[in-house]
Design a protein with these regions (language model features):
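Dynamic "connector" segments at or just before major functional cores
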Residues: 1-187, 192-232, 436-512
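Conserved nucleotidyltransferase catalytic core and NTase-mimicking acidic/glycine-rich helix/loop elements
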Residues: 19, 23, 410-440
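Structural motif
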Residues: 43, 74-83, 340-341, 389-398
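Short amphipathic alpha-helical "interface-anchor" segments enriched in bulky aromatics
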Residues: 102, 358-401, 405-412
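Acidic/histidine-rich, metal-coordinating catalytic segments
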Residues: 236-246
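Short, surface-exposed basic-aromatic patches at helix termini and helix-loop junctions that form
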Residues: 251-260
């Protein structure tokens, strides 16, 4: 054997790895199309978010939220607190309701940097990070920032809506108990006791409890804690709730503290008896929207005193569908036949400590439907219907975080439309979602936005107006701190609600 020849290796290296392709062709009705994938482009699907990010920066909302977060890491390899909370912010804004959806944010090469983040963390990092937050400290942290959002508005007359909503669960989660669940009877759930600022659709607080703790007695502690925290001078002009809240402990405490209330009553036997008696009388007054009203004073079983009760009725002029559930496996449907000399009425009963006329009371309670719309939006368009973990602590932390980010976005979209507050299903496609490419030249960063929305001209005009306002705020309010700038932003966003008045920030301490 010639020693100059190289020795043959007894173990060949095998096949060389194939080169990954980044282009393809597709035959379409318009002809052949060449498709290429660019994995390094500075693009984002949320191209109109920079204006929202400046809004957060000017008001100090995001910086304060990150700085106050009671989360500490001991490992040098752990993610930054700003990266973790920024990932939660982007996920909730995008309408996600599962931790797994966070992976879709990894394609965004623009907005994380604009938020001061170094990267988008993984879904597992978010789960582990939230697990490290002490529950009591975490809930206090979130409640502090919820209070910061609404505190400037509490000096105005306002209505406090109290209600609860059910979140069905499908696993072995902590607190997954069987309780009141109208849509999925028998399904374990969590109960969200919620306190809202009516008309503005702002969440003041949320308390996540096991599914069998849905009654008012489980939400009373949170209610009176909220009222104690905001101070007597800023209490609501009215406390409003549905049939579950019209009970003796809530009403007697409100009467003791001088807080006006308006609740719906259950149609108990005594209420029906009073209604039957009133039906024979003719002096029913107009209650608006086809309703008629008549008032009386009742002392129902369990009540400590007589109270003013308003009985409402409305004639039904539409076909009625009856459901016979004698055989649950096969319910029977039939249409009710109403004769020419017969009338069908819909009834309701309200209990109140207000002295207002019946027409005003009827409208005040109908306005509570806005609270139901907010629940629907939070559960179906935001994250209250998801982000479920085995422990109750992280469910509570995410519920508070979603409520906070919901408040931030709700107030921001009012800057875009001073007369309306569209829901997320409308505002996200118009004001958030658009393809944007970032370029840099001569030290200047440019974001080129391509919106596919049919009314993109409205978004452009709205953002030009918002950009002008924020520019004026930067130029004329350089000496203002974030709290004072937040008051200026709220005064602009809620100009119609405040009737053009400026909110007065608290005086700053003079320097010594």
């Amino acid at each position: 054997m010639d020693p100059s020849l190289p020795a043959l290796s007894p173990h060949p290296m095998g096949e060389q790895p194939s080169v990954e392709e980044f282009s393809a062709t597709a035959e379409t009705f318009a002809g052949r199309v060449h498709v290429e994938w660019d994995s390094g482009g500075q693009v984002t699907p949320l191209g109109q978010l920079p204006f929202f990010i400046e809004y957060l920066k000017q008001a100090g909302l995001f910086d304060g939220w990150v700085a106050d977060c009671p989360l500490t890491f001991s490992s040098p390899n752990a993610p930054r607190k700003r990266d973790l909370l920024g990932t939660v912010l982007l996920s909730v804004l995008s309408g996600h309701n599962r931790y797994a959806h966070i992976t879709t944010l990894r394609c965004d090469a623009v907005n994380p940097r604009l938020l001061g983040m170094t990267k988008v963390v993984s879904e597992d990092a978010v789960r582990r990070g939230l697990a490290k937050i002490d529950e009591a400290a975490g809930l206090t942290w979130l409640q502090t920032h919820l209070d910061y959002c609404s505190a400037p508005l509490l000096s105005e007359p306002w209505v406090l809506d109290i209600d609860s909503t059910i979140k069905p669960l499908y696993g072995q989660q902590e607190g997954a108990m069987v309780g009141y669940n109208p849509h999925k009877p028998g399904r374990p759930s969590h109960c969200y006791h919620t306190y809202m600022m009516a008309n503005l659709r702002l969440v003041l607080g949320v308390d996540v409890q096991p599914g069998d703790e849905h009654t008012p007695k489980h939400g009373r502690a949170g209610l009176w804690s909220l009222l104690h925290r905001i101070g007597r001078s800023r209490w609501p002009a009215l406390l409003r709730g549905d049939v579950a809240r019209g009970v003796e402990p809530v009403m007697s405490r409100a009467e003791q503290d001088g807080l006006r209330y308006l609740f719906r009553l259950r149609m108990t036997a005594n209420v029906k008896r009073a209604l039957t008696k009133m039906m024979a009388e003719r002096d029913w007054t107009n209650a608006g929207h086809g309703w008629q009203g008549k008032e009386t004073r009742l002392r129902l079983v369990g009540w400590s005193r007589q109270r003013r009760v308003v009985l409402l009725r409305r004639k039904l002029d539409r076909p009625l569908l009856l459901v016979d559930r004698a055989e649950p496996a096969q319910p029977l449907l039939s249409f009710a036949e109403v004769g020419p000399n017969q009338e069908v009425w819909e009834y309701a009963a309200l209990v109140t400590s207000l002295d207002s006329e019946i027409l005003t009371l009827g409208q005040l309670y109908r306005d509570r439907g806005d609270c139901e719309n907010t629940f629907d939006e939070l559960k179906n368009q935001w994250g209250w219907g998801g982000f479920t973990t085995h422990d109750l602590k992280r469910c509570r932390l995410l519920a508070g975080s979603v409520a906070l980010i919901f408040n931030w976005w709700s107030l921001f979209v009012r800057l875009a439309d001073l007369d309306h507050r569209p829901e997320a299903i409308t505002s996200r496609p118009l004001l958030m979602q658009a393809i944007a490419r970032q370029t840099r030249h001569a030290g200047q960063v440019t974001l080129t936005i391509t919106s596919t929305h049919g009314e993109r001209h409205k978004a452009r005009r709205a953002y030009l107006r918002i950009a002008g306002f924020l520019t004026r705020l930067r130029q004329t309010a350089e000496q203002l701190d974030p709290v004072q700038r937040w008051y200026r932003i709220l005064s602009e966003a809620l100009k119609r609600y405040l009737k053009g008045r400026q909110l007065d920030p608290p005086p700053r301490l003079a320097s010594v």
